[in-house]
Amino acid sequence: MALDRLLDDPQWQVVGLLTTITAQFDRVAMHGIRRDVLRAQAEALGLPLIESELEYPASNEVYERAFAASLHAARATNPDLNHVAFGDLFLADLRTWRETLLKRLDWHAVFPLWHEPTASLARRFHAAGHRAVLTCVDTTQLAADFSGRDFDPALLDELPVGADPCGEHGEFHTLSYAGPRFRQPLHLQRGENVLRDGRFQYSDFLLDPGPW
């Protein structure tokens, strides 16, 4: 939804995507999304992808160094770049941390969805044609069997009282595989379920080779 908001706003020109990848697992850290799935997602969206590699777990200092290196690489390709957009919704401490880090690096943070009501935002996501699955669930906040499910109105109706519909407190993480901005949907196969750190239930999703 943050990408939608930026692409619909003529004051912004989106030139690429940036995310962190764990070197030893070859995945997006908390989401558990495989690198090849992430690359297929970026290709389907028609946007270049910058992959910032980290060991996991990584300290804030290590994260900041890797993030700074990625921004330096992005600006080397596009010298006029000054802004990085985030999908954060209401966590003020996280926003302040991002803004402080970027200011130190001579960049500016943008939050297109800031203070959007999360209950309506979650439902608008699906109504607009976006499709996603839950790839990780924090089992201290949600039942493990939410992992792997479609992010749809039925799931939203089943969330327990106190759970944020957009997972802003880390209740869950998702993988978007189709939507209005996708040139074509990602075809995925469900893989195994794994509990990590005695807390995080991951559902693996692999690219389905077809034929299509």
Q: What is each stretch, according to the model?
A:
Residues M1-W212:
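Nucleotide-activated chemistry modules centered on ATP-dependent adenylation/adenylyltransferase
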